[in-house]
Amino acid sequence: MASKLLRAVILGPPGSGKGTVCERIAQNFGLQHLSSGHLLRENLKTNTEVGDVAKQYLEKGLLVPDHVITRLMMSELETRSAQHWLLDGFPRTLVQAEALDRICDVDLVISLNIPFETLKDRLSRRWIHPSSGRVYNLDFNPPQVLGVDDITGEPLVQQEDDKPEALAARLRRYKDAAKPVIELYKSRGVLHQFSGTETNRIWPYVYTLFSNKITPIQSKEAY
């Protein structure tokens, strides 16, 4: 088994269960889970230079452009150069993937393919704690008190773009941007696609895939 540092990426539309899969990979294999959404929230909260630039776009209801997200992630990855890591939410576009290429070779890419109806159902049951980014699902990860964050006691919200009428457009945007990224990694032989409606069914295959690349830190598979 290679002793080099593992560089992994997870791709998937909103509601695909990326966060859950990432947590399990981090727990079982000791990879640093680096979420672009989480890092963006941290930078917005602490008013960093890149956070202030991103805020200008978000306040106008615009997507944060590639060059801002890329700068945010490159800065974080520089500090993680001695660690195994797993990227979540980056790269989302071909421009971002090409920027990542300039600093490292990606060893492993997972793409989660979930049927639209499943995504719609999941997201209609999804509630967020805005300041931390904690995600709850009323079916399989409900808060202890309905509508309230477990840790802070602050109210949970449902994002506008999780609502069914916004989801189709959001999914189309994801697919359009992700298609060339998926093709790029497929052409390099590092892409592994998983289809299904249940994270627990996909997980054993993901676990086996990572076990072939890196020694688990748990003697037993953790769920």
UniProtKB/Swiss-Prot annotation:
Q: Name one GO cellular component term.
A: mitochondrion
Write out the catalysed reaction: a ribonucleoside 5'-phosphate + ATP = a ribonucleoside 5'-diphosphate + ADP; AMP + ATP = 2 ADP; GTP + AMP = GDP + ADP; CMP + ATP = CDP + ADP
Extract the ranges annotated as region (NMP): 35-64
Span of the secretion signal?
none
Which PROSITE patterns does this UniProt record tie to the protein?
ADENYLATE_KINASE
Keyword Zinc-finger on this protein? Answer: no
N6-acetyllysine, modified sites: 175, 179, 186
The entry marks the following residues as binding a ribonucleoside 5'-triphosphate, namely 15-20, 126, 135-136, 199
Keyword Transmembrane helix annotated: no
Stretches for region LID: 125-162
**What NCBIfam families does the annotation carry?**
adk
Q: Which HAMAP family match?
A: Adenylate_kinase_Adk (MF_00235), Adenylate_kinase_AK3 (MF_03169), Adenylate_kinase_AK4 (MF_03170)
Q: Which family does it belong to?
A: Belongs to the adenylate kinase family. AK3 subfamily.
Q: How does it assemble?
A: Monomer. Interacts with SLC25A5/ANT2.
Stated name of the protein: Adenylate kinase 4, mitochondrial
Q: Which gene encodes it?
A: Ak4
